[in-house]
């Protein structure tokens, strides 16, 4: 009924007499005369004063988005709230680097080894570029001019070159003296990953993906030349996060065994990660041989370690010497040695400034037991030669609390991002939550001298070929927790300028990260020009997010949006549930309705059953005229006290005290009831011959549940796989890999019946159910099911929301979703805005719902029964 050719139409509202519709169009109000079809803009002029002062002073305390240490370790450069500061690491004295006159975001600072320069990322020019300045922030110089994202800012140890990666899949070097930029290497697939420079500044190690999306570590001359893969594809599945040890003898990196998509793993088997050390030179002895075969040798090694612990001037001079890194390429890959037991997910790596130790972050990934799998997670220092592992004192428990507004940028992958050793090797600095912490290290934790003692074996002082790599006893740590590096600074905040910064930052991030460079046909520059003038009249962040959402809406894409920010919503009142439904009765009291299986009230020791009357709750008489929900808002851990009777009266009633369920737990109970009801429909309609399972989400827990449900249905003749109301995730390939299995044999043992060899597969007819609420990966799954010819799909077209998405934290702490990869079928169909069509179309209408029927499930059973009727039983089924 409207004919506008531009803008967006929002919030139509019809008058009570049905004659007029008022709506919002192109930032104005319009009126539609229903009878004539004519539209007219409603002119409104509102004069108002600003309700808040747009300029304010905020006190920022201890926030750190990113940091790096000065060469002396006495100061650190930090980024916070888009500004750069240097701070004394011992007393919190803080100095702001020269401030910009306009709102901008400066982040990811890196201090050169000679102390003369600080490099950082800044969007002060209108796009993310790399700048360098002196430590006071004077004479800033922009060294890049590329209209794309950059990352992995890394200084060479001699401070002559600055390396960085860019979204054009290249690794660049910038010469500080001559200002020349050169290409070091490039990738054919994606951006260069982690980057690390050798101690002599002659070599660079980096990771990049191959065509199968496996990450590999390479070494190349920093001046340019042949790059070499450091490992063997037959030995290691993937490598990344390479760092050089300070003595130049080892390249240390992480390696994974098996494939993981970040949500679940191939076949549901957990992917493991381990730390590996690659000896760069030929070795004339077994590195695992400690020559500690008796007590005397063990005591001598410990004495040598204690003597070296003081280090003194000679030790300092040795540490300052620059090693000449020599690489013996022959047999390089076979000199790789696993340092830690697989199972731990290893995060950042940082080399110690001397010797052959590295610091790392680790989280428990379910290792296969024993050894140094950093059980429980944390931060550790690992001597890659001796295998000694020492736990670093953690940040206090409150360290994870913070504003949550930092570090959302292009995630530099330089060595040791987030962990830095002090030059004296006595302190390790790291970020935790929103703060910066300093952890004291035990003597000989990470020096070459520390390795002289050998790895202390489990039963004594070690032995030949048995490096310990055990996590050190916590009592050896010099402090229970790390010390926070504290500071306080007052910042003047121009909220109008901040909103403009966030708007443009969000626009630029979508420009650089949206999976379709053509922006789904939208003129992205023109879109910004349409909405940017509105910034002048915005009054708060909610209005900012509204126009940003409208701007993003021009992309006509899913998995997008802006949320959160500096003014988080207050926590919602927690409603809790007793585990049964209340049904109004003519007596004026409520009756107990359905009791949820495995819920709070589903226990033999509770004297309560459907049909009982609830006379009161917590001494409040409960009548059908009362809103019982107000009594369901209680604190966690408290109990409901119900007065229950088998008749509508207090006389003879008894007390039932129930610990209620929180909202998410009750949602699980409701979901389980819904699944049971669908399963009952299938069982009754097929006389028990057809099985049923539902996939709630496309995540690891749902994959495990799917495998359990599949095993429970393995004796059924056919199977309904329901994935309606599934919001997606990333396990479609795992599911299809299981379902695509075909039976080619069976076994019969003596005095035993027919046995199927693989309970994790299903070999009978199958259908997949979908609806308009099946989204993202829950669309890729039925599309793959159809393409592989595994069976028919029943229901209605899916949502049409299939993009691989990420997220970016904007300067004000809000988050913008960034769809970075599209999905196409093998027939070149882009699945975004597509909607997978079913083979058999059937919808559930409101009338069916009111009658308690699920027509889609009934149709799925009908399809399978027809399939079964047309099949001949196999020998195994006869």
Annotated model-derived regions:
Residues 3-10, 19-34, 38-41, 45-52, ...:
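A flexible loop/linker signature enriched in serine peptidases of the S9 family
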Residues 536-590, 650-678, 861-862, 866-878:
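Extended, small/polar residue-biased N-terminal targeting/export presequences
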Residues 70-77, 82, 86-87, 331-390, ...:
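Long hydrophobic segments that form regular secondary structure
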Residues 302-321, 366-374, 399-412, 450-470:
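Disordered, low-complexity segments in secreted/periplasmic proteins that are enriched in proline
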Residues 12-19, 67-74, 108-117, 153-161, ...:
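Blade-terminus and WD-like Trp-Asp/Gly-His loop motifs, strongest in beta-propeller folds
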Residues 572-624, 699-700, 821-822:
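PDZ/PDZ-like domain segments forming the peptide/carboxylate-binding groove
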Residues 48-64, 325-342:
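A short helix->beta-strand "capping" segment at the edge of beta-propeller domains
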Residues 594, 598-600, 615-811, 848-856, ...:
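Cleft-lining beta-strand/loop regions that shape enzyme active-site pockets
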